[in-house]
Regions:
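Short polar/charged helix/loop
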Residues: 1-163
């Protein structure tokens, strides 16, 4: 859910081409499979397309391939921190609900053994926290993109004077 929500948010803010949102599990259960149909249905009810998602495992390369590693609960956060090859990589690991100021708990519940309403509730949590995460990342990202655009235009701004 979080991958789909965050990607959609980035696209709607005009930054989809500059942000890569992926999802990976800490176990190899369901590798290659689609998301649970109840997840896809919950996403669909809120206007998201979760049909392209396929489960894949988090690997050692995942740390170097990503600037941020977002865990949905403290158990996964602990596992990811243990897997980090060094302190810099460990520092990339954070909890999604840490970006929701109103969250009473830092763990996103696993709705797998629950009813449809729980899937919808979990999705609402993910949406709120994803907006908080995006608000935190957006200024630095836009600034970085602006600096790149400025560097591309700088040479023409400083052309030599004509005599």
């Amino acid at each position: 859910m979080a991958e789909v929500v965050f990607r959609d948010l980035a696209e709607h803010q005009g930054l989809g081409a500059h942000i890569v949102s992926t999802s990976a599990g800490t176990s190899e259960w369901h590798v290659g499979e689609r998301a649970d149909i109840r997840t896809i249905e919950a996403l669909d009810r809120r206007g998201y397309d979760g049909s392209r998602h396929r489960a894949k495992p988090f690997t050692a390369a995942s740390f170097t391939e990503n600037d941020l590693v977002v865990a949905l609960d403290r158990t996964h956060e602990r596992i990811l921190r243990q897997w980090a090859p060094d302190e810099d990589q460990e520092g990339k690991v954070t909890l999604l609900l840490a970006f929701d100021r109103a969250a009473e708990n830092l763990d996103v519940p696993d709705p797998y053994y629950a009813d449809t309403a729980t899937f919808d509730s979990v999705l609402a949590m993910i949406e709120t926290a994803s907006r908080g995460l995006f608000r935190q990342l957006e200024p630095a990202l836009r600034s970085s993109l602006g600096q790149r655009a400025q560097r591309r235009t700088t040479p023409s701004q400083y052309s030599s004077p004509q005599n």
